[in-house]
Amino acid sequence: MSQGTLYANFRIRTWVPRGLVKALKLDVKVVTPDAAAEQFARDFPLKKVPAFVGPKGYKLTEAMAINYYLVKLSQDDKMKTQLLGADDDLNAQAQIIRWQSLANSDLCIQIANTIVPLKGGAPYNKKSVDSAMDAVDKIVDIFENRLKNYTYLATENISLADLVAASIFTRYFESLFGTEWRAQHPAIVRWFNTVRASPFLKDEYKDFKFADKPLSPPQKKKEKKAPAAAPAASKKKEEAKPAATETETSSKKPKHPLELLGKSTFVLDDWKRKYSNEDTRPVALPWFWEHYNPEEYSLWKVTYKYNDELTLTFMSNNLVGGFFNRLSASTKYMFGCLVVYGENNNNGIVGAVMVRGQDYVPAFDVAPDWESYDYAKLDPTNDDDKEFINNMWAWDKPVSVNGEPKEIVDGKVLK
């Protein structure tokens, strides 16, 4: 009888459970979520991996829980003791859990705060990244100090602690821990190479390469300036100067493209004052729908593309705040809210924004990170779309994510 189905893909937290299935020779089918998309979405609305379905429809999520469950499925008692700790050795069991937790939470969280922005997957803020790197250094010191004196993290053999921690360290070795760093941390490097060569993980490292140098901060794209017209050969230098000055003056303050649409009958500032000073659901929203002109303004659902990389909710809210700050050149043509829903390490960003005109690009592309979001036009004559807008601006109802309600925990208003 089959022992179940494991959903796993390229994500680092799926490496260990997939490796356990192979090394322990479990009768567990391993499939990617994309290969069974409809079934996966029905069984696991959050669409997080790894995920496991056992006999009689038993469902399990979260990597540490799945790893434990898979080891317990093994008939090899010696291997179960090695990976989980002996039943009568409480200290070893606790240490195995401790090191797993440190890697799977504290260390893994910092991937989103260091590697992701350095790769351009999130806005880069030097102060934030430097602070996150300091946190990584402190965690690394804990590992290095342990491994200077011991072969493995928790016991005298490879345990789940080593497998989980090594898999998380992989992303750092690929991106941040270059040749110089590795020379300064020989104990971690020795341990990492030992664990990744084990039967549990060796197949995952076929294409692995150590980084030579750490990732560099992303470079801001410089706008190309139009070449200045060459002065006529017969003109004197003094005569050419006024023309150049005039060109420079006219290019200093380019008009916002939305200014070309002219003045609207819907007074945006009146709406912003109404929203700020009145109760949202009973007073402000009815006023909005009474005065809103769909020919002058369009409404858009804005969704962050990388919700699966978000960690702490306050950091997600800071991400929204930074995005809104970078939209400052367009705020006189916009209004909206982005909210953070869910909980730490399982949250997302979504919202509704109104912009002048029928195209979202001229309003949003003033922010360097505008392409980190998806934009879908909303139809205010559609009851579902209208209710979504009301909910995003009122913040008083849960967000529906794949049919599951998620409480709003924070948010920002663009006004």
Curated annotation (Swiss-Prot):
Keywords: Acetylation, Cytoplasm, Elongation factor, Nucleus, Phosphoprotein, Protein biosynthesis. The keyword Aminoacyl-tRNA synthetase does not apply. The keyword Nuclease does not apply. CDD domains: GST_C_EF1Bgamma_like, GST_N_EF1Bgamma. It is found in: Cytoplasm; Nucleus. Its main location: cytoplasm. InterPro entries: EF-GSTs, EF1B_G_C, EF1B_G_C_sf, Glutathione-S-Trfase_C-like, Glutathione-S-Trfase_C_sf, Glutathione_S-Trfase, Glutathione_S-Trfase_N, GST_C. GO terms for cellular component: cytoplasm; cytoplasmic stress granule; eukaryotic translation elongation factor 1 complex; nucleus; ribosome. GO terms for molecular function: calcium ion binding; core promoter sequence-specific DNA binding; DNA-binding transcription factor activity; guanyl-nucleotide exchange factor activity; phospholipid binding; translation elongation factor activity. The modification N-acetylserine is found at S2. SUPFAM superfamilies: eEF1-gamma domain, GST C-terminal domain-like, Thioredoxin-like. Residues 89-215 form the GST C-terminal domain. Residues 2-78 form the GST N-terminal domain. The modification Phosphothreonine is found at T32. Residues 212-256 are annotated as: Disordered. Present with 60865 molecules/cell in log phase SD medium. Subunit of the eukaryotic elongation factor 1 complex (eEF1). Probably plays a role in anchoring the complex to other cellular components. May be involved in transcriptional regulation of MXR1. The eukaryotic elongation factor 1 complex (eEF1) is probably a heterohexamer. Two trimeric complexes, each composed of eEF1A (TEF1 or TEF2), eEF1Balpha (EFB1) and eEF1Bgamma (CAM1 or TEF4), are probably dimerized via the eF1Bgamma subunits. The eEF1B subcomplex with the GEF activity is formed of eEF1Balpha and eEF1Bgamma. CAM1 interacts with EFB1. Component of a complex bound to MXR1 promoter region. This is Elongation factor 1-gamma 1. It comes from Saccharomyces cerevisiae (strain ATCC 204508 / S288c) (Baker's yeast).
